[in-house]
């Protein structure tokens, strides 16, 4: 395939981006598009063109026009909740704090971000509106308030709370009402995430000794263990199509990102770094982003679900 493009300035100051994709074997025009935009959106238009090329060549869903949310530590007591393009560019701070911020995640519609802030010297879960910057605390109970995660339909939040003793998984409505306990174990249950079909909640638990990934039906019933190939597994996340589960596996003292095919049960280590954390799938479920440490500095990396492709995002600050 051959991609050809042109960028031109219009008389009204806007930009016009034109692109053509040709089949080099037949010479046929496979795809074309014209984008007209202001200067602020030129790079996003380039990402949309990259998505069209990628989808035409692979048949898979788009990836490049998506957004990242992460926490950067800019100084000893300075933290930022950052929104950026998928390549780390167009970086914007959604929140600044002198206390740690952890566990940011997207709402399914991309309009809200729940996260945990320690600004009041205790962990509190907030939900922030991206359009306005307005936010409200939805979990400020005694003890631990952590690990928020939206259901696929955006109607339910899962959180990890220690309000009744050991940290357990609780569910609530997206507006913070209707809190109810979901797991009941003699261990620590944390890091919940929903399956794509909304039928299961995956989570980390040490109920059997060392931490492992479990899942429990949302409709009720006992939890079942999911991971068996590692003596230590944490931080589950499920792809939007429901095919893959990613998690952090400790192998010979190294914390590496693993991907499980939920249909076959096959596990694949997809990174070569040894301090990975917080994996998250791209919208098309074929790539994921994760945090790791290289030369004593926190960075973001990406990997394909088969481990064949990987890259590192630079210039993002200490993640």
Feature map (PLM): residue ranges:
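A residue-level detector for well-ordered beta-strand positions
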Residues: 20, 82-84, 104, 128, ...
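Beta-propeller blade-edge and WD-like acidic-aromatic loop motif
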Residues: 77-92, 112, 116-137, 155-156, ...
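Extracytoplasmic
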Residues: 2, 12-17, 63-65, 76-78, ...
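Sec/Tat-exported extracytoplasmic proteins
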Residues: 11, 25, 57-61, 117, ...
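Aromatic (tryptophan-biased) beta-strands that constitute blades/sheets of beta-rich domains
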Residues: 27-35, 92-95, 137, 183, ...
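Short beta-strand elements that form the blades of beta-propeller/WD-repeat-like
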Residues: 66-71
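Conserved beta-propeller blade repeats
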Residues: 41-45, 56, 98-116, 135-136, ...
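Amphipathic beta-strand/beta-sheet edge segments enriched in Tyr/Trp
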Residues: 1-48, 52
């Amino acid at each position: 395939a051959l991609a050809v493009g042109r960028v031109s300035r219009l008389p009204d100051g806007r930009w016009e981006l034109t692109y053509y994709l040709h089949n080099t074997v037949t010479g046929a025009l496979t795809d074309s598009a014209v984008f007209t935009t202001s200067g602020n959106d030129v790079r996003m238009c380039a990402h949309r063109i990259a998505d069209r090329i990628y989808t035409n060549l692979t048949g898979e869903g788009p990836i490049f026009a998506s957004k990242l949310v992460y926490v950067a530590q800019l100084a000893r007591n300075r933290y930022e909740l950052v929104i950026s393009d998928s390549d780390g560019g167009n970086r914007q701070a959604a929140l600044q704090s002198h206390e740690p911020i952890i566990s940011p995640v997207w709402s399914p519609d991309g309009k809200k971000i729940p996260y945990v802030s320690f600004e009041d010297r205790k962990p509190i879960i907030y939900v922030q509106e991206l359009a306005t910057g307005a936010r409200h605390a939805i979990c400020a109970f005694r003890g631990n308030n952590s690990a928020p995660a939206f259901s696929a339909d955006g109607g339910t939040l899962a959180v990890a709370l220690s309000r009744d003793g050991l940290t357990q998984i609780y569910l609530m409505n997206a507006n913070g009402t209707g809190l109810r306990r979901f797991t009941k174990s003699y261990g620590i249950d944390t890091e919940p995430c929903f399956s794509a079909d909304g039928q299961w909640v995956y989570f980390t638990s040490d109920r059997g000794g060392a931490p492992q990934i479990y899942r429990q039906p949302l409709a009720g019933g006992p939890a079942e263990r999911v991971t068996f190939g590692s003596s230590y597994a944490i931080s589950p996340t499920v792809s939007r199509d429901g095919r893959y589960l990613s998690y952090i596996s400790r192998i010979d003292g190294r914390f590496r990102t693993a991907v499980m095919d939920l249909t076959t049960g096959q596990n694949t280590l997809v990174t070569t770094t040894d301090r990975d954390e917080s994996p998250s799938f791209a919208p098309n479920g074929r790539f994921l982003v994760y945090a790791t440490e290289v030369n004593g500095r926190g960075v973001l990396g990406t990997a394909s679900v088969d481990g064949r492709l990987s890259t590192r995002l630079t210039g993002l600050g200490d993640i």
